[in-house]
Amino acid sequence: MQVYGCCELVRELYAQIGSGDQGYIPQAISCAVKALNDIAADESLPKETREKAAFAAANLLISDFED
């Protein structure tokens, strides 16, 4: 996926990280899994949203890509 296929908020943060205005996290996969896990665990969110986050986190965890 390219950055231009992402929502405006993602594109804004991407630009800020690229310019040095926002911090870069070298262990991006771990950061993503933690964020997705937080979303999946948040019972105030719709079940469909939580399931999408859980599915994405599980796929990242099972992939052979490591930080």
Curated annotation (Swiss-Prot):
According to its UniProt entry, this protein's organism is Vibrio vulnificus (strain YJ016)
Q: What top-level branch of life does the organism fall under?
A: Bacteria
Q: Which family does it belong to?
A: Belongs to the UPF0253 family.
As given in the record, the signal peptide range reads none
Q: Which HAMAP family match?
A: UPF0253
This chain belongs to which protein, by name?
UPF0253 protein VV2574
Pfam families, per this entry? UPF0253
